[in-house]
Amino acid sequence: MAFFSIFKQGQIYLNTWPLEAKLGIIFPENRIMKATSFAQKFMPFVAVFAILWQQFYAKNDLMAFSIAILTALFALLIPFQGLYWLGKRANTPLENQSAVWFYDICERLKQLHEPLPFVQEKPTYQHLAEVLKKAQSKLERAFWQEI
């Protein structure tokens, strides 16, 4: 998989995974996704603030400017760390227990005649996210209590 396609897959996974409280107990995705979304929104402002702060208070200090640039770069790279993790996670095959759970949810959705994602070999976390998204919209709330 190409380096930049991992980031794109991470963004797709971020947008697909349902942020249900019950899922947060089982999977780390909820915490990672909230942190990544927060970083995508606010880290560009932190980067700009770091440079502007340096320009206001230490205008002619090259060492302070280089530290401000490094701080800005670090702030801008934080969302990419989350997207990279999510992209890798999306393409990871499910563990055995999660795969059993995946097929159980698929059976429930098949009973409602819902189209399901095509799975060639072993389902991945992206497939699980797609099925959970459908389950969130098509199955009753009691489903989330059973988890």
Curated annotation (Swiss-Prot):
User: What are the transmembrane regions?
Assistant: 38-58, 67-87
This protein's name: UPF0208 membrane protein HI_1205
Q: Which family does it belong to?
A: Belongs to the UPF0208 family.
Q: Where in the cell is it found?
A: Cell inner membrane
Matching HAMAP family, A to Z? UPF0208
Give the source's domain of life in one word. Answer: Bacteria
* Cellular component GO terms held in the UniProt record: plasma membrane
Assign the protein's first listed, main location to one coarse class: membrane
Q: How does it sit in the membrane?
A: Multi-pass membrane protein
Coiled coil regions in record: none
Keyword terms, alphabetized: Cell inner membrane, Cell membrane, Membrane, Transmembrane, Transmembrane helix
The organism named in the record is Haemophilus influenzae (strain ATCC 51907 / DSM 11121 / KW20 / Rd)
Q: Name one Pfam family in it.
A: DUF412
